[in-house]
Amino acid sequence: MVKLRLKRCGRKQRAVYRIVAIDARSRREGRDLRKVGFYDPIKNQTYSNVPAILYFLEKGAQPTGTVHDISKKAEVFTELRLNQTKFKFNQ
C-alpha cells in the first residue's frame, strides 16, 4: 500500500518536510517512490505537485492526516473530484 506522508529534512530545530509517496511499510526516512511536494511549517510555505498527487490518489494512495490537511488547503481534492466527474461523463 502506498501512502502520501511527510519526510523530515533540514537541521536541528529547523525542520522542513517533503511530501512523498512511499510504501506504507517503510520507515520515515526510507526510500520514497516520488517526491510530490514540500512543506515548511516555520515559514508556513507549501509547494505541491498537484498532477503527481492526483496520480497517486487515483491509484489508491492514502494520505496521512497532516498531508490530507495540507492538500485540502491547496484544494487538491476539488481537482480530484473534477477529474472524476470528467472521467464519468466521457465513458
UniProtKB/Swiss-Prot annotation:
Its main location: plastid. One of its GO terms (biological process) is translation. It comes from the Eukaryota. SUPFAM superfamilies: Ribosomal protein S16. Gene3D superfamilies: 3.30.1320.10. Keywords: Chloroplast, Plastid, Ribonucleoprotein, Ribosomal protein. InterPro entries: Ribosomal_bS16, Ribosomal_bS16_CS, Ribosomal_bS16_dom_sf. GO terms for cellular component: chloroplast; small ribosomal subunit. Disulfide bonds: none annotated. PROSITE patterns: RIBOSOMAL_S16 (PS00732). One of its GO terms (molecular function) is structural constituent of ribosome. It is found in: Plastid, Chloroplast. HAMAP family: Ribosomal_bS16. Belongs to the bacterial ribosomal protein bS16 family. This is Small ribosomal subunit protein bS16c. It comes from Vitis vinifera (Grape). The lineage of its organism: Eukaryota, Viridiplantae, Streptophyta, Embryophyta, Tracheophyta. The gene is rps16.
